[in-house]
Amino acid sequence: MLAFNFFGATEGGLFDINATLPLMAIQVVALTYILNSLFFKPVGKVVEKREKFVSNNIMEAKNKLSEVEKLEADLLSQLQSARSEAQKIVSDAENESDKLYKEALELANNEANASKEKARLEIENQTSSARDQLFKQADDLSELIVNRLILEK
């Protein structure tokens, strides 16, 4: 018996086949069922619910991000068009200002030329009038001299 015990297992060992093994199997199945119904299913539902919540939030965030990017692009295009419009308005205002400046300068030059021409004509008239008066006075004086010379002779 000693030789048999040396090679084999003793009674009540791990590999004894009796009612304990099926009872342990039933306990494992029952424990698995109880844990599944009381712990794993509710935890699984909570995990699924949380996963759904997270995926919905991620989807919403992606949608909002795409909407923000679209709005940003729209605002950038509006800003660009506003800048170009403002630049056009400034350019038009500068052109109008230059045009008004040139018109005012031309008008001032025309008025100055007209005044100059008027002054020249007035000076010419006065010169002509003075010359005529001098000629008349010279005629009168020469007539007076001639009359005195005639009277003295």
From Swiss-Prot:
Any one Gene Ontology MF annotation carried by this entry is: proton-transporting ATPase activity, rotational mechanism
The compartments listed are: Cellular thylakoid membrane
Principal subcellular localisation of the protein:
membrane
* A Pfam family this chain is assigned to: ATP-synt_B
Give the range the annotation lists for the signal sequence: none
Bilayer disposition of the protein: Single-pass membrane protein
Outline what the protein does.
F(1)F(0) ATP synthase produces ATP from ADP in the presence of a proton or sodium gradient. F-type ATPases consist of two structural domains, F(1) containing the extramembraneous catalytic core and F(0) containing the membrane proton channel, linked together by a central stalk and a peripheral stalk. During catalysis, ATP synthesis in the catalytic domain of F(1) is coupled via a rotary mechanism of the central stalk subunits to proton translocation. Component of the F(0) channel, it forms part of the peripheral stalk, linking F(1) to F(0). The b'-subunit is a diverged and duplicated form of b found in plants and photosynthetic bacteria.
Q: How does it assemble?
A: F-type ATPases have 2 components, F(1) - the catalytic core - and F(0) - the membrane proton channel. F(1) has five subunits: alpha(3), beta(3), gamma(1), delta(1), epsilon(1). F(0) has four main subunits: a(1), b(1), b'(1) and c(10-14). The alpha and beta chains form an alternating ring which encloses part of the gamma chain. F(1) is attached to F(0) by a central stalk formed by the gamma and epsilon chains, while a peripheral stalk is formed by the delta, b and b' chains.
Q: What PANTHER family would the database entry show?
A: ATP SYNTHASE SUBUNIT B', CHLOROPLASTIC
Q: Which family does it belong to?
A: Belongs to the ATPase B chain family.
Record-given protein name? ATP synthase subunit b'
The gene it comes from is: atpF2
